[in-house]
Amino acid sequence: LGKRIAAGGGIEDGLRVLELLARHPSTARFISFKLAQRFIADEPPASLVDRAADVFTKTDGDIREVVRTILTSPEFYSPRYYRNKIKSPLELAASAIRATGAATDAAAPLVQAVARMGEPLYQCQPPTGYSEDSSHWLSSATLLERMNFAVALIGNRINGTRVDISRLATPETKDQKRLIDNLIAALIHSDVSRETRENLSKV
């Protein structure tokens, strides 16, 4: 750090070191990068990381302002980074339960499903937690488990969890196009590509 601290300061020496670390430019950039990686992309744009790091420094490390900078940035709303992140297994399971309106009173089967998808809860060995990098969640085995989870959920094959299919496919949606539109609106909350629509119409 390029600083010399005289001996004999006791606990104050330790606090001084922590303060030097907290105010170091590398700390501002590291924290800003990790937050941008969490909310934007595995490799967030350097320009955004720089702006967030500048806010971190100017606000004396106010994380709220750093997050505000990221979430209100043009990059956050850019089509290039829209839905750029792969959900972790826990995020996938929670959002699927919410999107389908499933009723559940059994945590164990869901926790087991999350573990099979690669994220055994509270069992991450490094103290830093599970990776924010999408590649950590993507493999042929974990993708298969994600598909199995989706099929089991919508097929009501997860013990203690029920999905009301009629909520997603009402009598008014017998027309295939309307059914696909309703499912996309309920589960995706925005449009999908023409190729995806064509593939759905073949199911």
Regions found by a protein language model. Give the residues of each.
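Nucleic-acid-contacting surfaces of polymerase cores and analogous helical-repeat interfaces
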Residues: 1-39
